[in-house]
Amino acid sequence: MPKVGMREVRRAQLIDATLLTIDQSGLSGTTLASVAQRANISTGIVSHYFGDKDGLLEATMRHILRDLWAATTRRRIAAKAQPRARLRAIVAANFDVSQVSGPVMKTWLAFWSESMHEPALRRLQHVNTRRLYSNLCAEFAKELPRACARRAASGLAAMIDGLWLRGALSGDPFDTKAALRLANDYIDLLLAQSAA
């Protein structure tokens, strides 16, 4: 009989092992067996919890996305009610420590690539994209006309993704301060235009 609570402990252990395996071997080198070996358990247990490699990647991405959404919620709550502060909070959440470690960044890159081919991953990517756009648009709409708010949200979302992607591909540790500075300058520029 399994121990109570062991399912979540084991799933977390396997997700951590997946992140580390993708970091070391890439997605193509990540197998149920390599994840099981890293977690020091049998391949059958990995199959039991996730079914196959696609199920394991989906669960890993859901974990990363939950961390992102939690960081976004936490930072938005801590921000002042002003749209500028809330926009900056959304940006900061996307560059949160939970999103910019080497293993997480490499897993994001693998996820983006696979989401073009796997419907379940495509749905996750779509939800994430829509959530970011919706959050940004809601804040910009408090300061800008609706059409301008939509353009601003699209532009800032593209900037966040671009800064993140350049950082991920650089091979160096992610420069969170530089990314925040650029994105926050862009927010200031957009909001200054509305005040003019």
Curated annotation (Swiss-Prot):
UniProt-listed GO biological process terms: glycine betaine biosynthetic process from choline; negative regulation of DNA-templated transcription
- State a single Pfam family of this protein: TetR_N
Keyword DNA-binding included in the entry's annotation: yes
Q: Which UniProt keywords apply?
A: DNA-binding, Repressor, Transcription, Transcription regulation
Q: Which residues bind DNA?
A: 31-50
According to the entry, every stretch annotated as the HTH tetR-type domain falls at 8-68
Q: Which Gene3D superfamilies match?
A: Tetracycline Repressor, domain 2 (1.10.357.10)
Q: What terms describe the molecular function in GO for this protein?
A: DNA-binding transcription factor activity; transcription cis-regulatory region binding
Q: Which InterPro entries has this protein been placed in?
A: BetI_C, DNA-bd_HTH_TetR-type_CS, Homeodomain-like_sf, HTH-type_TetR-like_transc_reg, HTH_TetR, Tet_transcr_reg_TetR-rel_C_sf, Tscrpt_rep_BetI
Q: Say which domain of life the source belongs to.
A: Bacteria
Pathway(s) the chain acts in = Amine and polyamine biosynthesis; betaine biosynthesis via choline pathway [regulation]
Check the record and name the PANTHER family matching this protein: HTH-TYPE TRANSCRIPTIONAL REGULATOR BETI (PTHR30055:SF234), HTH-TYPE TRANSCRIPTIONAL REGULATOR RUTR (PTHR30055)
Q: What does this protein do?
A: Repressor involved in the biosynthesis of the osmoprotectant glycine betaine. It represses transcription of the choline transporter BetT and the genes of BetAB involved in the synthesis of glycine betaine.
Spell out the protein name for this chain.
HTH-type transcriptional regulator BetI
The organism of origin for this protein = Paraburkholderia phymatum (strain DSM 17167 / CIP 108236 / LMG 21445 / STM815)
